Regions:
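Acidic, metal/ion-coordinating pockets
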Residues: 1-265
Length: 265
């Protein structure tokens, strides 16, 4: 089984990059399933139903979220019925949506779990205990278990990777929007990367205009974050190959921008 996961889609530039590159990436890598993190897809914050459907039309099979899950109020109207979407499972039980879903691809069932960290993030339920619970539940149905851990710090993400080594097929980090070069296979067979990176505006800061961010650092005054609709793009992702027992046998980063052009080789 081959999983292709694309990191945080930020705004229109990120969505356009998905539309442009997903067909080419599918032709090159031939993934069994394509998953994206969509928590910033609607102008940098949240997800609308229109964009959810657009991403599915553009070749995305499944979506994960993060701390901006409820950034667009309309998500309350469709998240419970969005069968190709998960939000962080360690949100309180009262939160709309669900944190683990299964996707069937031919004769393979894949569990997709979304978790959110707590270090320098909102104080929510324990992601480690929730991971234990959901992985146990998933293992009753499938050995193929994919985890998107949406978290701020390298240490918390690495801790989750080690915590789930041998139990989850892969643990990938999202949220910081900067791709890390530490992809590896942990000793018991779990594929891991601290952060997959983002898909969005290449010439800004974490997908937003740089001018306002720089001004805030200089003046310490609040600034409005502006997500541009035009500009050069970056696409960040990872391809993970799993064996028949659900263990990672290969993990490879994807990075496409003007400094790292797409190659069919």
């Amino acid at each position: 089984m081959r999983i292709m996961f694309i990191g945080d889609i930020v705004g229109k530039i990120g969505r356009d990059a998905i539309e442009t590159y997903i067909p080419q990436l599918k032709q090159k890598y031939k993934p069994t399933v394509t998953i994206v993190n969509a928590e910033n897809a609607a102008h940098g914050k949240g997800l609308t139903e229109k964009i959810y459907k657009q991403l599915l039309r553009n070749g995305v099979d499944f979506m994960t979220m993060g701390n901006h899950t409820y950034g667009q109020r309309e998500i309350y109207d469709f998240i419970d019925d969005a069968k190709r979407l998960v939000r962080p499972a360690n949100f309180p039980d009262e939160a709309p949506g669900i944190g683990m879903r299964f996707i069937q691809i031919n004769d393979i069932k894949l569990a997709v779990i979304n978790l959110q960290g707590r270090a320098f993030m909102p104080d929510i339920d324990d992601p480690f205990k929730k991971a234990d619970q959901l992985v146990r539940e998933a293992q009753e149905q499938t050995p193929f278990i994919f985890v998107d851990f949406h978290a701020e710090t390298t240490s918390e993400k690495y801790a989750m990777g080690w915590h789930l080594d041998g139990r989850a097929s892969a643990v990938v980090g999202t949220h910081t929007h900067i791709q890390t070069a530490d992809e590896r296979i942990l000793p018991k067979g779990t594929g891991y990367i601290t952060d997959v990176g983002m898909t969005g505006f290449y010439d800004g800061i974490l997908g937003i205009n740089k001018t306002e961010v720089i001004e805030r650092f200089i003046t310490s005054l609040p600034q409005r974050h502006v997500v541009p609709n035009e500009g050069r793009s970056v696409l960040s992702g990872v391809v993970i190959d799993l064996d028949k027992e659900g263990k990672t046998k290969h993990i490879e980063r994807i990075l496409i921008n003007d400094d790292h052009p797409f190659s069919t080789f």
